[in-house]
């Protein structure tokens, strides 16, 4: 944690409702009188958004090393120009995806958990050495997620268009991450009603605020 703020990330597979729940969480915290920065990854700053467009919608396939480093480059700009300044001002930062998504998508999804890929990713992560105070892991079985994505429609990005085996590896990666760090990562059943999910997230944040003394 930097300054007096609180850094919260939301993680999970496609269709889990992270973006919606991040927005609702930010609104609820603002209603309680907190100053909140709502942001996302990859993205969150003009430079990082340019990298996001290349990663999600670019026409050229990248090597796994290049893809990891581009995520880290976007994250570095995001941290330096948005997240860290907000935390120093004492704000709560609510971020849709962060380090855990890179590990799940690039490490487990694309890299299939290969030791070489995980070692490279771990080294790159140490260069952008900053961790959330609290991570809210939205968990939703893949069939339910697919139904949501179909109902949502809209443009499909590079990761959403991957084969089912890719998404199963991503979900397995998120499960491994949550199991390895149960203090930081709080699992939330994203199959509940949106209101129930929002309530669970807000409760977890209140508990973290108490512990951190924010």
Curated annotation (Swiss-Prot):
GO annotation, cellular component aspect: cytosol
Binding site for ATP: 12-19
Keyword Nucleotide-binding: yes
Biological process terms in GO annotation: dTDP biosynthetic process; dTTP biosynthetic process; dUDP biosynthetic process
EC number: 2.7.4.9
Family note: Belongs to the thymidylate kinase family.
Annotated protein name in UniProt: Thymidylate kinase
Species per Swiss-Prot/TrEMBL record: Gluconobacter oxydans (strain 621H)
